[in-house]
From Swiss-Prot:
GO terms for biological process: ceramide biosynthetic process; glycerolipid metabolic process; protein insertion into mitochondrial inner membrane; sphingosine biosynthetic process. Lipid kinase that can phosphorylate both monoacylglycerol and diacylglycerol to form lysophosphatidic acid (LPA) and phosphatidic acid (PA), respectively. Phosphorylates ceramide but not sphingosine. Phosphorylates 1,2-dioleoylglycerol more rapidly than 2,3-dioleoylglycerol. Independently of its lipid kinase activity, acts as a component of the TIM22 complex. The TIM22 complex mediates the import and insertion of multi-pass transmembrane proteins into the mitochondrial inner membrane by forming a twin-pore translocase that uses the membrane potential as the external driving force. Disulfide bonds: none annotated. Residues 61-202 form the DAGKc domain. Component of the TIM22 complex. Its main location: mitochondrion. GO terms for molecular function: acylglycerol kinase activity; ATP binding; ATP-dependent diacylglycerol kinase activity; ceramide kinase activity; D-erythro-sphingosine kinase activity. InterPro entries: AGK_C, ATP-NAD_kinase_N, Diacylglycerol_kinase_cat_dom, Lipid_Phosphate_FormReg, NAD/diacylglycerol_kinase_sf. It catalyses: a monoacylglycerol + ATP = a monoacyl-sn-glycero-3-phosphate + ADP + H(+); a 1,2-diacyl-sn-glycerol + ATP = a 1,2-diacyl-sn-glycero-3-phosphate + ADP + H(+); an N-acylsphing-4-enine + ATP = an N-acylsphing-4-enine 1-phosphate + ADP + H(+); 1-(9Z-octadecenoyl)-sn-glycerol + ATP = 1-(9Z-octadecenoyl)-sn-glycero-3-phosphate + ADP + H(+). The gene is agk. PANTHER family: ACYLGLYCEROL KINASE, MITOCHONDRIAL, SPHINGOSINE KINASE. This is Acylglycerol kinase, mitochondrial.
Length: 422
């Protein structure tokens, strides 16, 4: 008992040192426990991947080849370590022949895609910027019709991974997020995604999977990091200071758009059986003696563009890739025009909400479904676009929807969640 009293007396007399020791031990224990949980997640994922690698293949079959485009600079330079610890072991254990190509500077992924050889699957390891560069480089190729059929996997290693929410289960644990995304590539289930082709008058086209933003909310989002010292109030502060500098922040443009296009019926997954020999001979003789009449070529109908002048707080052009499983009658993209009648207080509130999901339209926004759009901007002071969270100089552009252009690997669990949310 005397020893216990002596211990408590020592702790009381040296309470500052005792408090510091408790904080250090608590942090160290939490860090060790987190590392242990991450190791358990990696081990379970590797065991699941090993089951794929142990499957027997025929003597004439060859290993699947995967080309990985890795951006080591993603996630503030941590992407290479995250990939080597959490994704690379899973791919190797699954028996996939992996070729890793690392980028050295911004924009290199576009050039690498021009030189890439045919592969069984393409894996993009990085964030929104890496994904947008690879997709743009892929669809700029002369043989993009062939390469666009290659299934694509996305391993979220960046600071911003917006598309990952549509493909993988959302998790706050970085290790679990990466391992589940890598395993979904091995399982082979895919979903089709729409692509936006954005083309200026002189520039080469840029391609996007999420959308295009132009307006006040986008401009403020680029300055939020300057108010880091305000902690959780930095987003509200950035919008408040912006409203003090200029209000209202109206953006004026001329908008033309085409109506949505009806979605064609899906092709059957199963290839129909080949008819028997006698039936094929009969059809050939019938076509020989009574050849089918050739229909005259139909002249394409002129495009019916609708035009209007817009005055808006922010204009966004979005794909429907947020829920790629949802069945739609028309192939279309969504044009959203935020009302210019917002008060400064509403601007701050809506801007705070948009910092969580930048592509979410605000209440009372005018929404237009279209298959193509032309945006005519003023020659001076147009500002900048955000295309898939990447900054581009704003100019007059034409945006066209390429429906179901690419196929991405998707986890079965996330697909079920999206199907239930319809």
């Amino acid at each position: 008992m005397a020893r216990v009293v002596k211990v408590f007396r020592t702790l009381r007399n040296h309470w500052k040192k005792s408090t510091f020791a408790v904080c250090v031990l608590s942090y160290g224990g939490h860090w060790l426990y987190g590392n242990h949980c991450d190791s358990v997640l990696r081990r379970e994922a590797c065991i699941e991947a090993r089951a794929f690698g142990q499957q027997l293949i025929g003597p004439q079959e060859i290993l699947k080849k995967a080309t990985v485009i890795l951006n080591p600079a993603a996630c503030k330079g941590k992407a290479n370590q995250l990939f080597e610890k959490n994704a690379a072991p899973i791919l190797h254990l699954a028996g996939v022949e992996v070729k890793i190509v690392k980028t050295d500077y911004e924009g290199q992924a576009k050039k690498l895609m021009e030189l890439m050889e045919q592969t069984d699957m393409l894996i993009i390891a990085g964030g929104d910027g890496t994904l947008q560069e690879v997709i743009t480089g892929l669809l700029r190729r002369a043989d993009e019709e062939i390469f666009s059929k290659t299934p694509i996997g996305f391993i979220p290693l960046g600071s911003s991974n917006s598309l990952s929410q549509s493909l993988h289960l959302v998790s706050d644990n970085k290790v679990q997020h990466i391992t589940s995304a890598t395993l979904s590539i091995l399982k082979g289930e895919t979903v089709p995604l729409d692509v936006l082709q954005i083309k200026g008058e002189k520039e080469q086209p840029v391609f996007a999977l999420l959308g295009l933003r132009w307006g006040a909310f986008r401009d403020v989002a680029t300055s939020i990091s300057k108010y880091w010292y305000l902690g959780p109030l930095k987003t509200r502060a950035a919008h408040w200071f912006s409203s003090l500098k200029q209000w209202p922040q109206v953006h004026v443009a001329s908008l033309s758009y085409l109506a949505p296009v009806p979605r064609p019926p899906d092709l059957p997954d199963e290839i129909p059986q080949r008819p028997n020999l006698l039936y094929r001979i009969y059809r050939r003789l019938q076509n020989y003696w009574n050849p089918p009449l050739e229909e005259p070529p139909k002249e394409p109908e002129p495009e019916q563009w609708e035009s209007k002048d817009v005055s808006t707080l922010e204009l966004t052009v979005l794909t429907h890739n947020k829920n790629p499983v949802k069945r739609r009658v028309d192939d279309s993209m969504l044009i959203s025009l935020d009302p210019e009648s917002l008060t400064a207080g509403q601007f701050i509130t809506e801007g705070t909400n948009k910092s969580v999901d930048p592509m979410e339209p605000i209440e009372n926004a005018v929404q237009i479904e279209a298959s193509a759009a032309r945006l005519e901007l003023p020659e001076e002071g147009a500002g900048f676009y955000d295309i898939d969270n990447q900054e581009y100089e704003a100019m007059s552009v034409e945006v066209r929807l390429l429906p179901r252009k690419l196929r991405f690997f998707c986890s079965a669990e996330r697909r079920e969640q999206l199907a239930e949310a319809q």
